[in-house]
Amino acid sequence: MSKRKAPQETLNGGITDMLVELANFEKNVSQAIHKYNAYRKAASVIAKYPHKIKSGAEAKKLPGVGTKIAEKIDEFLATGKLRKLEKIRQDDTSSSINFLTRVTGIGPSAARKFVDEGIKTLEDLRKNEDKLNHHQRIGLKYFEDFEKRIPREEMLQMQDIVLNEIKKVDSEYIATVCGSFRRGAESSGDMDVLLTHPNFTSESSKQPKLLHRVVEQLQKVHFITDTLSKGETKFMGVCQLPSEKDGKEYPHRRIDIRLIPKDQYYCGVLYFTGSDIFNKNMRAHALEKGFTINEYTIRPLGVTGVAGEPLPVDSEQDIFDYIQWRYREPKDRSE
C-alpha cells in the first residue's frame, strides 16, 4: 500500500491536511495508532463535508470529530496554524523520522534507528546504502517517482496491460485492481491487484505457481521492472508504463499482486477496495447481524460468540446480502 495520501483539495483542505499531518506524526513518531486512526477518521469525514467549516463547534457535529480535534480546528481557523504542528516541525528528530518513513521499506522503527545514527536525509541514506536492505534501496532509488500520485488515466493504462497479460497466461484467471482506484479516485498511490484462479482454493494442499507465472509474463513485457519481494501468494514490486513515441518516460510505480483462493476472493476484493472506514462500519454492522467478516471469509456467530464455518461467497453482493445491508457500489465506499 502507498505511504503517500492524496493532498486534500476540498472546501476544508487546510483542516484535512492538518489532521493528516497530525495522524502521520502519531503513527510514525509516537506510534499511537489509536490517535492516528482518530485523526484519519476525522479528516475523512471533514473531506466529504459539503460546506466550509467555520468553527470547531460546527465540525464537532460530524461523526468522528471529538472535543480535542474541534479545539485544534478552532485554533487553526483563528491563526492559520497549529502550535502542536509547529512544534513537531521544529523538532529535528520528529521531522526526520516522519520524512524517512516516506521511503518505501522504511517503517517507524527503522526510521528512528537511522535518525539515532545521524542518518536524516536522502543524501545521508545514499551515503549509507550498505545499511539499507534490498527493499529500502529500491525505495531510495525511486523515491521521487514513488512520491508522485498516479493519475487515473495512467492507472487505466496500467490496468489494461495487467489484465490483458494475465489473460494471455491463462484465460481462467480472474483479476481486480482494488484500492482507491476501484472507488473511482482521480489519483492513486500505487497499484493493488488481486488475483485468483479456479484451480486454487482454500482446500488446495499446495499452492500452484499461479502468481509466479503472472509476474514472469509482466516482466517479459517489461512492465514489472523490479522485485521487492516475491512469495507464493504475494508479490511486491515496481512497474512502469512503456515510453511514449516522443520518448517521454513514465515514472516508476509501486505494484502489489496478491493471489487469493477462489472461495475467499470476493471477501478479499471487498476488503482491499476499502475504504478503511467503510470496512470498519461494515464489520460493525455484520456483528450486529450475527456475522464476522475479514479479508478471507464471512462466518456466522453462534450463541456463544464462536464463529462457524465460512459461508459460500461468489460475489461482493453475496456478502452484503448475508448481513442484510444495501449493496454499495465501489464509488460509494469512500466514507
Swiss-Prot record:
Catalysed reactions listed for this entry: DNA(n) + a 2'-deoxyribonucleoside 5'-triphosphate = DNA(n+1) + diphosphate; a 5'-end 2'-deoxyribose-2'-deoxyribonucleotide-DNA = (2E,4S)-4-hydroxypenten-2-al-5-phosphate + a 5'-end 5'-phospho-2'-deoxyribonucleoside-DNA + H(+); 2'-deoxyribonucleotide-(2'-deoxyribose 5'-phosphate)-2'-deoxyribonucleotide-DNA = a 3'-end 2'-deoxyribonucleotide-(2,3-dehydro-2,3-deoxyribose 5'-phosphate)-DNA + a 5'-end 5'-phospho-2'-deoxyribonucleoside-DNA + H(+)
Cofactor(s) listed in the protein's UniProt record: Mg(2+)
A GO term from the CC aspect: microtubule
Binding site for K(+) 2: 101, 103, 106
Binding residues annotated for Mg(2+) 2, in chain numbering: 190, 192, 256
InterPro entries: DNA-dir_DNA_pol_X, DNA_pol-X_BS, DNA_pol_b-like_N, DNA_pol_B_palm_palm, DNA_pol_lambd_fingers_domain, DNA_pol_lamdba_lyase_dom_sf, DNA_Pol_thumb_sf, DNA_pol_X
Residues reported in the UniProt entry to bind Na(+) 2: 101, 103, 106
Stored PANTHER family: DNA POLYMERASE BETA (PTHR11276:SF42), DNA POLYMERASE TYPE-X FAMILY MEMBER (PTHR11276)
Name by which UniProt lists this protein: DNA polymerase beta
Record gene name: Polb
